[in-house]
């Protein structure tokens, strides 16, 4: 945050800054911290020791470019060199050695792992330390407990039982006396009694037998080990027993870490040094003292709020990468120890590099990181749907993951908004569904203190000194500091007009919201958007929307597809430029100079006598199959300055975010076609490519070696295939660039060798060879065919050849998709809908100047959803369109005066009506509404209709990827019923509820057909197709369908035999005919 010369002016921090700061901390501090922990590896038998030094480590530049890493499915990484020393007898060798590769963060704040962009999101966890709580049991008696949480997430509890004895519960089952625990940690009874405030309570409960157990540390350790490990009998104290207890309990559950030590000192008023990161007897005694005070002293009821951000910490990318580096060094230690043993067996002289060079050792580092990025829940595939998603993804915070909560067990309180989130975590932006409230997004001004893991928010300090100097100092407050300040909300900006000392303002103090005098205020928020994330800050008039709809809007903006011709919004909030800039989809000039030439692939810039080539992204596929493309925006010969936009990316216009289109909308019902959130659109949106988007799909095939040792072959010479299917292949058997391909066409021809079957040696095969000259094929055709819905233009073909037999071919196909019935569209206020009908433009309702409307929304979608912001936006958008203006409006403008939003909209509509001389734009009887006409009849509608220009997005949920049909296809081998899912070419299934619905109508014959003949009766389903086509009667089969046979087999597996008997109609005698 930078304070400018202008009073009260500040710049918004970079939105991707959090990821970059985290990675820089890992490189500068995390690597050194873990290398310092690396132990000296000694082999006393051979007088050898190996050591790594933390100082002077180096990272080389990556050997490949980002683009090559993506295309060739490689990891974008850098080689790490460390100083090492090897002492062998009297010989001392020092060498800088390579210990492996570390993935490097790119300019987007992401990593490229095996060719895929991945990002590590921040995890929010309970801080290590101690937490107290009191709760009532079933008898109404208060139970007091203290929970000690270690740095690794292990928990130990201190509790006082009904007999007023103090116990430490070290796991769910075992509990031990607090005196035994303290003695096992090294304190004797005298030291315990000297260091506590309630010695009489400590002395009241141990009997003579318990006092014997704590006479010495050894006896206490034996007692602790017996209860902790549930071991009976007489144990003898030994060093191995002590080491096992140290490893299983003290190292796992007693390591507080740097943050835990600070929290423990602060909570219990201790002064233990920060470098003592393990639990000490003094900590346990102080914690027990406090627990006794809560139980026996009246008035001490200080339960800890576990959901307060002061009791949480952020595990950023720095912490997670550092943990993995420590894990890799641990594996490296074991590998070096094994290598030392092998060296002496072979009797060769080692060097530091030869101890680390063996293949398995040198790839330990990169394999550890690749496993982490591939399997860790907080490592996600980078969302590249549009520039907004690229900016927002790295700012997510999640309570899920190892050591955190789970979607199924998290309580309502842990999901709820907490007052400490104010200005730190957005109260709106969270996922919908089972993880609601567990994943959030950082507010735009929030920053992470990477040392302590707290989230800080900036405020203006309003002190006497600052008032005299007439300047405002920005202070960053962590969650545990802002409890001591009176914080005024952002709407106190209106106080600049009047006498501030005489006014009262809403403020926050200790999680309560109050109204107090201005002179009592300590700090105030700096920006109206301070409480919201980027997604929430892009919603105009957000203060007029219900929070649930704002949540949907911030999520749906991330699903917007970049359109072929982007258009920036008429009504915005002002953050569009910063969001587009920080997404790095545009090309920004890094230095000033003059443009020499531009084309679709690169821009040549002359600067300080040097010619710089700036490559552009052209039709690159994103992780979500959208098209990433940069278009040059500077003409040849133009002089440019540093920071100027040279080329614009997808979904940006003029350096601003442009996710949708400004279209003319009307809020009215139309023949039921916009019932229940359906949307009626004009064919103009199709024919003029208003909502046309490009999508790129990737198809790949790999050659392999068969079990017989024969290699698969990519070729055009594929026997027994129609020439039509092979028409697009070149002489190598790969589809040509620029070809138009349809469903079923072959993209890459491939033959898999097979052992010749016996049929190739029988007489008929010899006859075929003699007469027709045909050779019996010994290869199986396994070509890459274009699946259903994949039609398009081939724009790129990549050959990746690791060795002569291992070849991978990737084909990229570009699809142009116009908007069609079934596509999903949405506004920026949670108003979403599916296209139900595309009307000819002459049939659409039209305005008084003859302009046909582009979209018709249902007006009933507004009052019940309470997202009135869309009405303000559409009316102001209409005025802006007529006046050729763009508006950037900050939220909560009612802080200046009442009804400020409505006054602004009406005044702009009135101005537009005056300038265009169209009185229908603003009619005082029904402002914002107008009489419009039915395009089919030319008659005016009965009621005036609200019309406006709204910014509508096309979402990635498109009908082309969802629509599916099947006549026949694959069946499940066991049940012989159609398989499930579009990807498997599956079919529909009459489930339980559908059967109930049919039973309700009593349609027995239809039910019988659906559940037997048409479904899983092998013979009948073939015959029923023929009978239906020719209009014959459906044949009746007596044998059971396949699913019934499965039931019989399952009963047999339970030793139950199922038989059936035929009963004669004449005399009802039973004939036992076993099937």
Curated annotation (Swiss-Prot):
EC numbers: 2.7.7.6
Location(s), subcellular: Plastid, Chloroplast
The UniProt record lists the keyword Nucleotidyltransferase: yes
GO CC annotation: chloroplast; DNA-directed RNA polymerase complex; mitochondrion; plastid
Keywords on record: Chloroplast, DNA-directed RNA polymerase, Nucleotidyltransferase, Plastid, Transcription, Transferase
Catalytic activity as recorded in UniProt: RNA(n) + a ribonucleoside 5'-triphosphate = RNA(n+1) + diphosphate
BP terms from Gene Ontology: DNA-templated transcription
InterPro entries registered for this protein in UniProt: DNA-dir_RNA_pol_bsu_ext_1_sf, DNA-dir_RNA_pol_su2, DNA-dir_RNAP_su2_dom, DNA-dir_RNAP_su2_hyb_sf, RNA_pol_bsu_bac, RNA_pol_bsu_CS, RNA_pol_Rpb2_2, RNA_pol_Rpb2_2_sf
GO molecular function annotations of the record: DNA binding; DNA-directed RNA polymerase activity; ribonucleoside binding
Pfam families noted in UniProt: RNA_pol_Rpb2_2, RNA_pol_Rpb2_3, RNA_pol_Rpb2_6, RNA_pol_Rpb2_7
Top EC group: transferase
Function description: DNA-dependent RNA polymerase catalyzes the transcription of DNA into RNA using the four ribonucleoside triphosphates as substrates.
Assembly mode: In plastids the minimal PEP RNA polymerase catalytic core is composed of four subunits: alpha, beta, beta', and beta''. When a (nuclear-encoded) sigma factor is associated with the core the holoenzyme is formed, which can initiate transcription.
UniProt cross-references to NCBIfam families, sorted A to Z: PRK00405.1 (NF001616)
Family: Belongs to the RNA polymerase beta chain family.
Name of the protein in its database record: DNA-directed RNA polymerase subunit beta
Native organism: Oryza sativa subsp. indica (Rice)
Primary gene name: rpoB
């Amino acid at each position: 945050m930078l304070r400018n010369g202008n009073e009260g002016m500040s710049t918004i921090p970079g939105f991707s800054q959090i990821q970059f700061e985290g990675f820089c901390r890992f490189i500068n501090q995390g690597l050194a911290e873990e290398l310092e922990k690396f132990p000296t590896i000694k082999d006393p038998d051979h007088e050898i020791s190996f050591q790594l030094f933390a100082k002077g480590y180096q990272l080389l530049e990556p050997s490949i470019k980002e683009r090559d890493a993506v295309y060739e499915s490689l990891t974008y990484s850098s080689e790490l060199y460390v100083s090492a020393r090897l002492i062998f007898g009297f010989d001392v060798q020092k060498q800088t050695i390579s210990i492996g590769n570390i993935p490097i963060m790119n300019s987007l704040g992401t990593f490229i792992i095996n060719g895929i962009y991945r990002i590590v999101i921040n995890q929010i966890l309970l801080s290590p330390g101690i937490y107290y709580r009191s709760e009532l049991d079933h008898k109404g008696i208060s139970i007091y407990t203290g929970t000690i949480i270690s740095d690794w997430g292990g928990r130990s509890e201190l509790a006082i039982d009904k007999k007023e004895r103090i116990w430490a519960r070290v796991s769910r089952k075992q509990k031990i006396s607090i005196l035994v625990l303290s003695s096992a940690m090294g304190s004797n009874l005298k030291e315990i009694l000297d260091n506590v405030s309630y010695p009489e309570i400590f002395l009241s409960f141990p009997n003579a037998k318990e006092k014997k157990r704590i006479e010495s540390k050894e006896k206490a350790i034996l007692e602790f080990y017996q209860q902790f490990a549930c071991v009976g009998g007489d144990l003898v104290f030994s060093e191995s027993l002590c080491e096992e207890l140290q490893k299983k309990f003290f190292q796992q559950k007693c390591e507080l870490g740097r943050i835990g030590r600070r929290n423990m000192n602060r909570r219990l008023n201790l002064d233990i040094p920060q470098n003592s990161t393990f639990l000490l007897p003094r900590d346990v005694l102080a914690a027990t003292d406090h627990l006794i005070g809560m139980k026996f002293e009246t008035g001490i009821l200080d339960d800890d709020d576990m959901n307060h951000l002061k009791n949480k910490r952020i595990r950023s990318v720095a912490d997670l990468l550092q943990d993995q580096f420590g894990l890799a060094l641990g594996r490296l230690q074991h590998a070096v120890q094994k290598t030392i043993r092998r060296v002496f067996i072979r009797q060769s002289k080692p060097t530091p590099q030869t101890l680390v060079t063996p293949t398995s050792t040198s790839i330990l580092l990169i394999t550890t990181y690749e496993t982490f990025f591939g399997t860790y829940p907080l490592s996600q595939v980078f969302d590249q749907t549009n520039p907004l998603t690229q900016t927002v993804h790295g700012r997510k915070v999640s309570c899920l993951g190892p050591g955190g909560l789970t979607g199924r067990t998290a309580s309502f309180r842990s999901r709820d908004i907490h007052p400490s989130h104010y200005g730190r975590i957005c109260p709106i932006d969270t996922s919908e569904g089972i993880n609601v409230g567990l994943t959030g997004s950082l507010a735009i001004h929030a920053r992470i203190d990477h040392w302590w893991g707290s989230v800080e928010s900036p405020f203006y300090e309003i002190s006497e000194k600052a008032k005299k100097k007439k300047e405002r100092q920005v202070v960053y407050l962590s969650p545990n500091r802002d409890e001591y300040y009176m914080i005024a909300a952002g709407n106190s900006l209106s106080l600049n007009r009047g006498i501030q000392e005489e006014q009262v303002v809403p403020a926050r103090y200790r999680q309560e919201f109050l109204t107090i005098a201005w002179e009592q205020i300590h700090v105030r928020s700096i920006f109206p958007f301070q409480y919201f994330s980027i997604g929430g800050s892009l919603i105009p008039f957000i203060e007029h929307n219900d929070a649930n709809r704002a949540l949907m809007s911030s999520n749906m903006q991330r699903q917007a597809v970049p359109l072929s011709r982007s258009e920036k919004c008429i009504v915005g909030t002002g953050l569009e430029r910063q969001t587009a800039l920080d997404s790095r989809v545009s090309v920004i000039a890094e230095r000033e100079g003059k443009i020499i030439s531009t084309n679709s692939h690169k821009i040549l810039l002359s600067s300080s006598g040097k010619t710089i080539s700036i490559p552009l992204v052209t039709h690159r596929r994103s992780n979500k199959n959208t098209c990433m493309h940069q278009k040059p925006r500077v003409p040849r010969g133009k002089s440019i300055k540093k920071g100027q936009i040279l080329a614009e990316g997808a979904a940006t216009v003029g350096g601003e975010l442009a996710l949708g289109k400004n279209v003319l909308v009307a809020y009215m019902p139309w023949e039921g076609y916009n019932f229940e959130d359906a949307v009626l659109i004009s064919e103009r949106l199709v024919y003029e490519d208003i909502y046309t988007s490009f999508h790129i799909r990737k198809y790949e095939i790999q050659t392999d070696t068969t079990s017989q040792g024969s290699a698969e072959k990519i070729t055009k010479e594929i026997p027994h295939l129609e020439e039509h299917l092979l028409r697009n292949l070149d002489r190598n058997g790969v589809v040509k660039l620029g070809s138009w391909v349809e469903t079923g066409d072959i993209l890459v021809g491939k033959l898999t060798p097979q052992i010749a079957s016996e049929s190739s040696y029988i007489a008929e095969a010899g006859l075929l060879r003699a007469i027709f000259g045909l050779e019996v094929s010994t290869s199986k055709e396994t070509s890459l065919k274009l699946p259903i819905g994949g039609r398009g233009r081939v724009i790129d073909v990549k050959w990746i050849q690791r060795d002569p037999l291992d070849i991978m071919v990737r084909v990229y196909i570009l699809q142009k998709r116009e908007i069609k019935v079934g596509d999903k569209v949405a506004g920026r206020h949670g108003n979403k809908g599916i296209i139900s009908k595309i009307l000819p433009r002459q049939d659409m309702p039209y305005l008084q100047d003859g302009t046909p409307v582009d979209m018709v929304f249902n007006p009933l979608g507004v009052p019940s959803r309470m997202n009135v912001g869309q009405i303000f936006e559409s009316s102001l958008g209409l005025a802006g369109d007529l006046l050729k203006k763009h508006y950037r409006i900050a939220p909560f403008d009612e802080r200046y005066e009442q009804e400020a939003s409505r006054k602004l909209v009406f005044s702009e509509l009135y101005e537009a009506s005056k300038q265009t001389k169209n009185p229908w734009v603003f009619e005082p009887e029904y402002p914002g509404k107008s009489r419009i006409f039915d395009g089919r009849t030319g008659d005016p509608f009965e009621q005036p209709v609200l019309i406006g220009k709204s910014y509508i997005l096309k979402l990635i949920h498109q009908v082309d990827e969802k629509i599916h049909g099947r006549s026949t296809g694959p069946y499940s081998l066991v049940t012989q019923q159609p398989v499930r899912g579009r990807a498997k070419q599956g079919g529909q299934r009459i489930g339980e509820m559908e059967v109930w619905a049919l039973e309700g109508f009593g349609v027995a014959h239809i039910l019988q057909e659906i559940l037997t003949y048409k479904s899983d009766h092998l013979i009948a389903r073939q015959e029923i197709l023929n009978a239906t086509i020719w209009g014959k009667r459906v044949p009746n089969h007596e044998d059971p369908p396949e699913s019934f046979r499965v039931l019989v087999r399952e009963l047999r597996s339970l030793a139950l035999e199922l038989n059936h008997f035929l009963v004669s109609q004449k005399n009802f005698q039973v004939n036992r005919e076993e099937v």
